[in-house]
Amino acid sequence: MRNVCIAVAVFAALAVTVTPARAEGGHGTFTVGYFQVKPGTLPSLSGGDTGVSHLKGINVKYRYELTDSVGVMASLGFAASKKSSTVMTGEDTFHYESLRGRYVSVMAGPVLQISKQVSAYAMAGVAHSRWSGSTMDYRKTEITPGYMKETTTARDESAMRHTSVAWSAGIQINPAASVVVDIAYEGSGSGDWRTDGFIVGVGYKF
């Protein structure tokens, strides 16, 4: 998560510095939005139902207007989810399992100004998904009254990852001169690695 925050900060800094340097060519727009991704039917890494329905995170976009009607846009998205559970398998034995998913996407594409308040865009790029899971069986033994000792009897870890083509389409609405509302769909991959995402954000037009 720390690396993602650094990437977002760099993305924002570049947006702010590039726009003034080329102000004669047009305006810049920076948006930050809520990002929700629905993963495909992934096999469980921990021997049971993954329990993961959606990954949630953040999306940032920078738009630069080349002319009054045409512009370009870049996008960076990150979403994650973690699920864990513990079940009692005996009088003093337990089974723990967890699954963690991460999704990162980078895209760019053209923007078309449809009207004074509405713009439409389409982008393409790459997305990287990573899933890691772990299981552990352990036993609890009472050493002294009130003190329990946990002893691991079995442990297993596994991970899988996939990089695929990503695409997105959306609109940006200007309810005010410097305010932007961003709504978009994002998809990537196919089969078990197919994802569908939804983005809603707000931003500022420089």
Swiss-Prot record:
Membrane topology: Multi-pass membrane protein
Keyword terms, alphabetized: Host cell outer membrane, Host membrane, Membrane, Signal, Transmembrane, Transmembrane beta strand
InterPro entries per UniProt: Bact_OM_Invasion-Related, Enterovir_OMP, OMP/PagP_b-brl
DNA repair keyword on record: no
Pfam families (UniProt xref): Ail_Lom (PF06316)
Location(s), subcellular: Host cell outer membrane
Recorded GO CC terms: host cell plasma membrane; host outer membrane; membrane
Keyword Plastid annotated: no
Family per record: Belongs to the outer membrane OOP (TC 1.B.6) superfamily. Ail family.
Designated name of the protein: Outer membrane protein lom
Protein species of origin: Escherichia phage lambda
Lineage: Viruses, Duplodnaviria, Heunggongvirae, Uroviricota, Caudoviricetes
